[in-house]
A protein has these predicted regions:
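Membrane-cytosol interface at the C-terminal ends of transmembrane alpha helices
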Residues: 84-91, 144-148, 175-178
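Hydrophobic, membrane-facing alpha-helical anchors
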Residues: 32-35, 87, 143-154
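Alpha-helical transmembrane bundle and helix-membrane interface signal
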Residues: 96, 152-164, 214-218
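C-terminal transmembrane module of polytopic alpha-helical membrane proteins
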Residues: 1-17, 24-26, 179-254
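Cytoplasmic-side transmembrane-helix entry/capping segments in multi-pass membrane proteins
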Residues: 102-109, 137-139, 163-170
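N-terminal TM1-TM2 helical hairpin plus the immediately adjacent luminal interfacial "cap"
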Residues: 14-135, 181-205, 209
Length: 254
């Protein structure tokens, strides 16, 4: 058997924050579904218009909360199902890696960043009619999670379409390329916010690099001497001499 199959990504557990995010998205979907089919409006707006990201409403009315609330809205049950499956599969792994609080912060950061990125692209390049269409879904945040997965588990294999083994880092790069090309060529004709996906990946990758990958610089107030002492401490070892006593060996300082 191909050794790559020994490195395939395992099915992760359903972790606490990921589970709660899924529950929240499902609950919001059904509330929106019921209210929409009953024709219920709030101050003349349907729930998707209030909580989805509508560029014209953000620009004209200052409804900035939409940059966060749009994440939990979904337009169709298949849209919801696909996003939640991906959130469970990749999100649980990243939650285990970052911890609950950091994962929740990261999820919201990527979602809001994706919304801001897509909003900016719409203002700069879209026609006026496009600005009135709500952007909804957790996909931007989920693409940020994919970026984190591709960084933290770069060498791990998993089956693309349940058939083709591919390293995570290559899969993430491929997805980024597909979204970029599709976003430029589609001109929004497929009703998918490709630039929200790209924005989520970009924000997520930058954050992971700065927060976890880039070597940390000196702490505030540290002198050069303190920095050197910390470096030396990391090299310090204890050995036992032939008399059975602990003996210090390594760099010394005073």
């Amino acid at each position: 058997m191909d050794s790559r199959y020994d490195q395939l990504s395992p099915v992760p557990p359903l972790t606490a924050i990921t589970k709660n995010l899924i529950i929240l998205c499902v609950a919001v979907y059904f509330i929106d579904f019921i209210l929409t089919h009953l024709g219920v409006q709030i101050q003349g707006y349907y729930l998707k218009e209030l909580l989805g990201l509508v560029p014209s409403l953000v620009k004209e009315k200052g409804w900035v909360w939409q940059f966060a609330t749009y994440i939990f809205m979904h337009g169709h049950h298949l849209h919801l199902l696909l996003n939640m499956l991906i959130l469970w599969y990749f999100g649980s792994e990243i939650e285990l890696k970052l911890g609950r609080k950091q994962f929740l912060f990261y999820f919201l950061l990527c979602g809001i960043g994706a919304g801001l990125f897509n909003y900016s692209v719409n203002l700069l390049f879209s026609d006026v009619n496009r600005l009135s269409h709500p952007i909804i879904g957790a996909s931007g945040a989920i693409f940020g999670i994919l970026a984190a997965y591709g960084i933290f588990f770069a060498e791990r294999y998993f089956l693309v379409f349940f058939v083709f083994p591919m390293k995570a880092k290559y899969f993430v790069l491929l997805m980024a390329l597909v979204e970029l090309v599709t976003g430029v060529e589609s001109n929004a004709s497929d009703n998918i916010a490709h630039f929200a996906h790209i924005g989520g990946m970009f924000v997520g990758a930058i954050y992971i690099y700065l927060r976890y990958i880039q070597p940390k610089g000196p702490k505030s107030g540290q002198s050069k001497r303190d920095i050197e002492r910390e470096k030396l401490k990391k090299q310090f070892t204890l050995i036992v001499n032939d008399k059975g006593q602990k003996e210090e060996k390594g760099p010394y300082w005073n």
